[in-house]
Amino acid sequence: MSCDLHIHSTCSDGAVPIERLASIAARTGLHAIALSDHDTLLSAQYAYAHTGQDEVELIPAVELTGYDFERQHRVHLLCYYPDVDCPALREHCAIMKERRNACALQSAKELEQLYPQFTTDLAWETTKASGVLFKSGLMQALELLGLTDGSIYGETY
C-alpha cells in the first residue's frame, strides 16, 4: 500500500484545490493520502466527509505550527485524525490564522510599494479556500501579473 502522509492543498500553502487531490493521487498510484494543511481544520473536515474519494483513502490531518523553546525555532507537528471540535485546537488554528494574515498583509503592503500593479485584493483571490494569506498566495498573484521572471524571488524574498 503506497501513501503520502503529508499533503497540502489550497486550504493552506498548496497549489492544488482539495477537491482534486484524490484523483491526482489515484492517477499516481497512491492508495491513501493525509490532507495535512497548515494550522487549519478545513482539510481534516473535508477528509472526514469524503473518506473514500476516487478509491483513495483520505486521512484527516493537520500540520500544527509550534515553537521549540529549547532550540529556539519553529517546529511543525503532524496530527492525524484530529478532533475538529476540540476548543483548544480550534483556538490554536484561529491564533495562527490571525498571525499569518498579519505577517502576509505586511508583505503585501511592501509588494504594493515595489510593484504598483500588484494589489492585496488580487493576492486574497488566490486564497479563497482558506481565508489565510500565505506567501505562496503572494507569489501566485505576482505570477499572474507576469512579475516572476526569476529575479524577483531572490531580490524581494
At which residue positions do the language-model features occur?
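An N-terminally biased module of ancient metal coordination in phosphate/nucleic-acid-related enzymes
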Residues: 1-72
